Structure formats: structure tokens, C-alpha cells
Amino acid sequence: MKSSVEQLSPTRVRIKVEVPFAELEPDFQRAYKELAKQVRLPGFRPGRAPVKLLEARFGREAMLDQIVNDAVPSRYGQALAESEIQPLGRPDIEVTQKEYGQDLAFTAEVDVRPEIALPDLTGLSVSVDAIEATDDEVNAELESLRARFGTLTGVERPVATGDFISIDLSAAVDGEDVPNAAAEGLSHEVRSGRLIAGLDDAVVGLSVDESRVFTAKLAAGDHAGRDAEVTVTVKSVKERELPEPDDEFAQLASEFDTIDELRASLREQVLQAKRVGQAEQIRNATIDALLERVDVPTPESYVQAQYEGVLHSALSGINNDEARFNELLVEQGSSRDAFDAEARTASEKDVKRQLLLDALADDLKVQVGQEDLTERLVLTSRQYGIEPQQLFVYLQENNQLPSMFADVRRELAVKAVAQAATVTDTDGNTIDTSEFFGKPPENDVTDLLDDDADGDAGVDADGDTENSAEPADADSADTAQGAG
């Protein structure tokens, strides 16, 4: 087999492949043998029918088509391996020669990872927001803690903001009751905004057993998106009594003896939460600083796949109803055109980020260890509320483990650069990034980038070379090894 590669653009190539007919003859023999087992021809035992009779019965062209369809994917994969191309997405394949007894020829156009000239990281510096825990934030945490230890007491007065009420609900569209839209004994905190839009305004001022009708859009069912007349009836009213914020409360609600000690602990909790946000800001600022220093060509099909993933996520919550999605955008003061423009811009930036970090990980010789993958599995499984083993099985069955590997590898690349960067906050304070990302390696990142050693491949946990071209979403743009 012969193959050659033509560079069409920084992000796309055309691979030309020629397969000698002699290489396909064994495929023909196997195909005829299998076909002979499946058909019965008069005068011949199963599996004994001559090739010429099979060709006369089924046609040589049909057999040739089948052989070519089976041969192209494997030969395409072989051409990729020989040329060391890292494809992004599925190829566009065209068979240019297909005749019995002649060489098979086809071309495959596919997007590829572009060559990226990495920026000079010497003196890289980023700035992030300063953080502090304000008294208001500490008080809010204290109020939340007091609410957890509060008691509900029934009151004989109209509903007010902050009350806890029990209500009955029913809905009608065009005067007809809506099935499955009625509920009794629902608990609701007034002004929490957790149920139907307009409900809080409707119940304020009502007494027990009083009702009010208001208009709201139904979110689900056959009448989803339509205006309905909703009737709410108040069945009970309770108010929450909070414990006094004193030393006694501190001893009840925590391991501390005094309210001052409890406040100090809450202040540290607020700061810790903000440090998590600051770490994320450092990551993003580091990536943005890198992107400002380098030009990253973007494969259009890769950007399109990323955009389609964003759109799919947005539509999945409303049963893929694009008309309703467009209505919701208008209700929010936006439009479909604005959404598409923002989503495409974000998708293009995300693709640039992925490609840059893949190239950076190559040059830094990033190694993804078992602990790194396990940590990501645990964190992701917590987000979905499932066991890590369940998530692992799902990713394995859906061929998404390579995608997770690539994401972890990119994260380690960002971490390495952030460790070496100078990070300050808006107040001029230098931030010790080791608190977020650990200590930098003995070899400086900038030294590693100057290393002349080959850095075209990452290393996986077993020490094998690993192609890192997989996108963040394996379903949206997977690395193709077939003619698909």
C-alpha cells in the first residue's frame, strides 16, 4: 500500500491511498467463502459453490463494493499510522478507482492538529481579583446556620415574605383542567422562587383557606409553554423562629465555645470558598495570557462540533424543542442569532484552548498518572451523584475514557505553567500558587520548553505513548479510524 499526504491548510490534509489489487485478493477469497456458506445452489453442497457461479448469481460489482467498503477503513487507519497524522473528527472519503483486477485508490480529507509555535513563557505574569471575607458575607453564613437550627411555628395571620406555607395547586388552559398539573399539600418558602413564577406574589396576603388565581406558563406536559390559569389555596402558615446568635448557639451548632470563634471559622470558610474561585481565575487567566501570545489555527469542523455540543446541551432540557428554545431566549431579552454568535465564539475559543494545551503538554512531556485519573473520576462522579466505578463503566462503554485522559493532561499542563508564572492580585499582592497547584518541578517549565527532545506525544500511566487529539466531548468530534 502507498500513501501520500497533501497539506490543504494548517488544519486540514488530503491523504491519497493506493492499495494493490493483490492485497485485496485474500479479502475476495474470504468473502466468497462466507457467501458460499450462506447460499444454496442446486447441485452443490453448502460452501462448495464455484466462484464463477456466485459471481453470476450476485454480481462481481456487488462483491467488489463490499470488499472496498470493508477495506477502506483499515487502510485509512494504516495511512494515519504511517504518516503520524493526528486527526480531529471524521474524514471525508472519496473512492477514485475501484475496478476488479485494478488497484484500489481513494482520498481522505480530514482536519488535523495544527503545528503551533509555542510562546516564550519567560516572565509570564497574570493578575486576578483580590479576595476578602466581608462582614456581610460572614453574617449571611451565620444567618444560614441559624436557619438550619430554627423552628417552625404556626401563625394565624396572612402570608408574609419568609413564611413557610402548605398549598394546593391546580391549573386550567382555555377553561379545561390540565391533567397531572394539580397537587395538594405542597410545602413552599415564600419568596424562595423555587416553584412557579408568580406564585410568591399570589400568596402574599392570603389567609388559610383563601385562594387566588394567577397566570403562569406551564413548563412540561402536553401544554408546555402555554399560559395557564393557576389556582393556589393556602392550607397553613408557619414562621421560622431563629436562635439568638450567642455563645449558647455557637456551642449548639458547632465545636466552638463562643460566637466570636464561630464567626472566625465562618470567615475562614468564606475565604476558602473564594480561594477555590481564585484558583479557577488563575487557570483561566493563565490560558488567556498564553492565547494572547500565540496564533492557534482552528479547524472549522472541530469548532462546529463543539458548537453543536453546546446547542445540544441547551436543548436537552426542553425536549429538543427549538421553537420553545427561541421563545425562551426572547423572553430573556436575547435572540437565537445572539445565542448562536456567542456559542460559536465560545466554541472557537474552547477549541483554541484545547489545541494549545495539547501542544503545551507535548512540549512539557506531561505524564498522566493513575492518581490523576482517579482524582478526576472521583470529582466528576460527585458532580453526578454516582459512584466512581459507575462513572468509569459508563465512560468505558461510551468510549469517553480517552477524552477524560486528554482533559486531565491539559489540566496538568495549565497547572505546570501556573506554577511557574508570577501571579498578583488587584491589590498588588503576590499570590503563592503552590497553595492551589503544589510546588513546581525541579526543572523550570521554561527549561523544559527549550529542551530539544521530541515532545510530540504524551505519556500515559503505563508509559505508553498516547495521542492527545481527542476533544473534550468524545461524542461531538471523535478521532476517526473508519471511513464512517
Swiss-Prot record:
Entry's Gene Ontology molecular function annotations: peptidyl-prolyl cis-trans isomerase activity; protein folding chaperone; ribosome binding
PPIase FKBP-type domain location: 162-243
BP term (GO), one: protein unfolding
Subcellular location: Cytoplasm
EC number from the UniProt entry: 5.2.1.8
Record's function text: Involved in protein export. Acts as a chaperone by maintaining the newly synthesized protein in an open conformation. Functions as a peptidyl-prolyl cis-trans isomerase.
Similarity section: Belongs to the FKBP-type PPIase family. Tig subfamily.
Database matches in NCBIfam families: tig (TIGR00115)
Protein name as it appears in the record: Trigger factor
Gene source species: Mycobacterium ulcerans (strain Agy99)
